[in-house]
């Protein structure tokens, strides 16, 4: 029984699904997808639970969310192993994901009050009050790269605001989704407040097409995000938050501290086997001897990165990709760029055929025409050389995406110029592109999102503002508007 609807664990009536470890092919989870009727049932349960949940005092909702945080801490080792085994990422990195989930609770509570709490301004004849109200029933679509943390970034603020939810994890990480929901169950969520439906494309389409949804919160690919945007077009009454990845540039202007610059590049491009939406996909390196030396050092160090299993000892820097198919897609993207005229600096290599273990690849594309503007979700780094900083900014902005952008330079003025001219929601200076803070908004422009950033700003799309002018008494103004006559006439 792998669906949780209205407080009950039930068996899906849709397609049978099996999840294996992407490296060892060990079977980890088996279950059935939710069919359209069960998706509708989950929505009905969420709708029925909404009035009571929304009327709960905020402190009552907060108490349940904080109990969930306590359970995350108590089961950190178990959840870490589930995430690591299911995604293929190393244990150390899965542990950081669970830590991020725990930290998200306190941050979301602070963000609720800062962004969407209640504010009152005293007026001469009363008060002006700003309150926030939950939307109602929201669908949450989770990704596979951070199957615990990223859905958590929608679920926690949405519950705090008083919404009820239907959560569909990625079909590639059903085990993590189920494990997290079981902790929410133990935290004491009332029946119907949070519902779990497992499944792939058909389940997702059934969920996103429900008439009774009040909104949808999505993290995933641009292609799916655009599809959801088209599907919900003409429905302005529904809130839609899309986080859709990027084709992110990292500019290496000054690599005087060469090993530090190489380390930052590795962290930007290859952490999580290149499966972070903020990962550097395009490396822009200044022409000249220093740039040549930097690239040689990068290729040297990156060539020594050996992906490993989640539980290897010592731990590897990177593990496997989410699937053997994902690894194959990266290989095909590399070969395509070679065919266009790219010069391979470091060839990606499958460690073992049929698994998702893949070594990093680096290819130079300076002067190559018609390079696809796409997010290749894996450890493949494209290199361009540039002559001057204005050209670097032009290259950085030469994408339909706009999630993250970074600069390695000792010149503050160059960073200030980049802040003014970059088209990206995250612009870092001498910090990895993959570094982000939950105390700041997380999101992008262009094809990277629809201006609904998450993290600190997630509270914004989880509630709507209600403005009130209030007075405990009704009084006639001392000064009336022109043309109004309230004098009493004597009866004739």
From Swiss-Prot:
Its EC number is 1.2.1.71. It comes from the Bacteria. Pfam families: Aldedh (PF00171). The active site is at residues 243, 277. One of its GO terms (molecular function) is succinylglutamate-semialdehyde dehydrogenase activity. InterPro entries: Ald_DH/histidinol_DH, Ald_DH_C, Ald_DH_CS_CYS, Ald_DH_CS_GLU, Ald_DH_N, Aldehyde_DH_dom, SuccinylGlu_semiald_DH_AstD. Gene3D superfamilies: Aldehyde Dehydrogenase, Chain A, domain 1, Aldehyde Dehydrogenase, Chain A, domain 2. Keywords: Arginine metabolism, NAD, Oxidoreductase. Coiled coil: none annotated. GO terms for biological process: arginine catabolic process to glutamate; arginine catabolic process to succinate. It catalyses: N-succinyl-L-glutamate 5-semialdehyde + NAD(+) + H2O = N-succinyl-L-glutamate + NADH + 2 H(+). Catalyzes the NAD-dependent reduction of succinylglutamate semialdehyde into succinylglutamate. NCBIfam families: arg_catab_astD, PRK09457.1. Belongs to the aldehyde dehydrogenase family. AstD subfamily. This is N-succinylglutamate 5-semialdehyde dehydrogenase. It comes from Salmonella typhi.
